[in-house]
Regions:
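Solvent-exposed interaction patches of small proteins and small membrane subunits
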Residues: 1-102
């Protein structure tokens, strides 16, 4: 299977959009965030979106490299083992996968 650059470019655009939405709506303090449930929902939803997009990218890259992850977290672990992803980032993403499932 060949790497689909168009898919990756689209996913990276979606990731940028999710991060941008979080950045543009980020409150100046934790107190302001805690006081605004709509803002909390927007931030959480875009964090979930960003994590899911990263999972999609990692799964695509793993599959393109003949890896067969059984879970979302395994995709990051396998990419790190192949030297395609920093180990610390892989560990953080595995934790983020768990956050997404909360």
């Amino acid at each position: 299977m060949n790497l689909n650059r168009d898919v990756l470019i689209a996913k990276l655009g979606q990731l940028h959009d999710a991060i941008d939405r979080i950045e543009t709506k980020r409150p100046r303090s934790l107190e302001l965030l805690l006081a605004d449930r709509d803002l909390q929902d927007m931030v959480c939803k875009n964090i979930e979106r960003a994590v899911q997009i990263c999972i999609d990218i990692a799964t695509h890259l793993a599959t393109m490299n003949a890896l067969a992850p059984k879970t979302s977290g395994e995709s990051f672990k396998m990419l790190a083992a192949k030297g395609m992803l920093d180990t610390e980032l892989a560990t953080a993403m595995i934790r983020a996968v768990g956050f997404r499932n909360v």
